[in-house]
From Swiss-Prot:
Residues 164-214 form the DHHC domain. It comes from the Eukaryota. This is Palmitoyltransferase ZDHHC14. One of its GO terms (molecular function) is protein-cysteine S-palmitoyltransferase activity. Disulfide bonds: none annotated. It is found in: Endoplasmic reticulum membrane; Golgi apparatus membrane. Its EC number is 2.3.1.225. It catalyses: L-cysteinyl-[protein] + hexadecanoyl-CoA = S-hexadecanoyl-L-cysteinyl-[protein] + CoA. Palmitoyltransferase that could catalyze the addition of palmitate onto various protein substrates. Coiled coil: none annotated.
């Protein structure tokens, strides 16, 4: 009878169930915690306002300086210059200035408060799948083995483009995407990080950034020109208003005195406006011209600085994204459809789900609820990125099933960090003590692996009975099948992968966070 053997196995499985993180029963005197939104646990270094509707970089000091300069300069112009110009020249001047000011502020806020095109980070399952693919492609590694760089190559309009692997986001970045070190996010069609707008400039806000600097150039030139006009007209008006002949004769004898007499009565605020506009117009107009050149050639600032499509890299190197036409490139950058945001900022975090416990110093223990809740929240904040990569490159390969005995065991993922880097995955075996599995001589060799499997299960804790792997079902013997059966063929790869994934899933999530 094998009942005496089954009882310790069941007892071991029951002991693996951890109840420290089980969901408590609803009681009337305990208030339920309000579910957090996903922006509250966003992994990047960003600031969110208005309950996640506004997304900015963490460094916003220069952005406020931009706001102050625009508001102060425009306010002085509308308060002191526009009344004189409207009464002496035309009322269209303050009207045009007002339209330009509203447009500039609208484009600035739109570029600053928008999602620039942040790419979601890989889920723990995707990160583990990519790690398995990379390890499988690199082959076995020796003590002095140096793995090759993690890149993939795609062909875009006849030009080979490399997709680099991001060790922070655990993804192969799409073409033209880059990781911003300040915001700690991968941004699609990354142009640059602009501190003046307090945000990254990418695919989703580049048009607003360009329209902001272009309209700001017109507004700066407009204010600079009409402030000088106001100063000149006011000086001429006061020079002609000299009433006494004595003053007029004194001024004629001393031309420098005329200038001092006129300028001393000119508003100092007009001079302040002229100075601010004079030093601003050169940088803003130059920046607008540079980005006009980039749009006309369908490049980004990042690509231009690195010289990605420069002819110095070779005669066959060219920009595969350019349409070869100025108008078409401008329409593509400014008039194309705006892609939707790929991150769910205002979604709710679901209640905590059970997570496998980690191993520390050879003993198993359930992690604290606070750490587990934060891990679960960040896991739900990260969305799938496979559809993003499929749009830019070939589909991601699925992990190959591991068949026991058919090849070398799966190695531990050293690049993920955490407990998974030191603990190899368990190798499930056929428990020969279960009835019906001790009739073949070929199965006797599996008893050693059975002991290893039970020893590994004894050091694991599963949070809920649903995640506890059930004992393997009785399998037919080789003698009953009537022909020789290799032990590797008695296992279903799916069941073996499920046992491995159940025991490692929580560890991968901890290491990926």
């Amino acid at each position: 009878m094998h009942l005496g053997v089954e009882e310790p196995i069941r007892e071991c499985q029951y002991n693996q169930i951890c109840t420290h993180n089980s969901s408590p029963m609803d009681t009337p005197h305990i208030k339920k915690k309000k579910n957090k939104r996903k922006w509250q646990v966003f992994p990047g270094r960003n600031r969110f306002y208005c309950n996640g509707r506004i997304m900015m970089a963490k460094q916003t000091g220069v952005f406020y300086l931009t706001m102050v300069l625009i508001l102060v300069t425009s306010g002085l112009f509308f308060a002191f210059d526009c009344p004189f110009l409207a009464s002496n020249l035309t009322p269209a001047i303050p009207a045009i200035g007002g339209v330009l000011f509203v447009f500039v502020m609208g484009m600035l806020l739109r570029a600053s408060f928008s999602d620039p095109g942040v790419l979601p980070r890989a889920t723990p399952e995707e990160a583990a799948d990519i790690e398995r693919q990379i390890d499988a492609n690199n082959g076995p590694s020796g003590p002095g083995y140096r793995p090759p760089p993690r890149t993939r190559e795609v062909l875009i309009n006849g030009q080979t483009v490399k997709l680099k692997y991001c060790f922070t986001c655990k993804i192969f970045r799409p073409p033209r995407a880059s990781h911003c070190s300040l915001c700690d996010n991968c941004v699609d069609r990354f142009d640059h990080h602009c501190p003046w707008v307090g945000n990254c400039v990418g695919r989703r806000n580049y048009r607003f950034f360009y329209l902001f600097i272009l309209s700001l150039s017109f507004l700066t030139i407009f204010i600079f020109a009409f402030v000088i006009t106001h100063v000149i007209l006011n000086a001429l008006r006061k020079a002609l208003a000299l009433s006494t002949a004595a003053d007029f004769e004194a001024v004629q004898k001393d031309p420098t005195g005329l200038a001092f007499l006129v300028l001393s009565k000119t508003a100092l605020l007009d001079i302040l406006e002229v100075v601010v506009c004079f030093f601003s117009v050169w940088s803003i107009v130059g920046l607008s011209g540079f980005h006009t050149y980039l749009i006309s050639s369908n490049q980004t600032t990042n690509e231009d600085i690195k010289g990605s499509w420069s002819s110095k890299r070779g005669k066959g190197n060219y920009n595969p994204y350019s349409y070869g036409n100025f108008i078409t490139n401008c329409c593509s950058a400014l008039c194309g459809p705006l892609p939707p945001s790929l991150i769910d900022r205002r979604g709710f975090i679901q209640p905590d789900t059970p997570q496998p416990a980690t191993q520390t110093n050879g003993t198993s223990a359930c992690p604290p609820n606070q750490v587990q809740s934060h891990m679960c929240a960040q896991d739900q904040c990260i969305q799938s990125t496979k559809f993003v990569l499929q749009a830019a490159t070939n589909p991601l390969l699925h992990s190959q099933p591991v068949i026991l005995g058919g090849g070398p065991p799966l190695q531990a993922k050293t690049s993920l960090g955490g407990p998974c880097s030191t603990m190899g995955p368990p190798q499930p075996s056929l428990p020969s003590s279960i009835p019906g599995l001790s009739c073949g001589g070929e199965l006797m060799a599996l008893r050693d692996s059975e002991i290893h499997c039970h020893h590994h299960l004894h050091h694991q804790h599963f949070i809920s009975p649903e995640e506890t792997p059930s004992p393997p079902a009785p399998l037919p013997c080789a003698t009953h099948l009537g022909h020789h059966v290799h032990p590797a063929q008695l296992f279903d790869p799916v069941s073996q992968d499920s046992l491995h994934e159940d025991s490692v899933r929580g560890l991968v999530k901890l290491s990926s966070v």
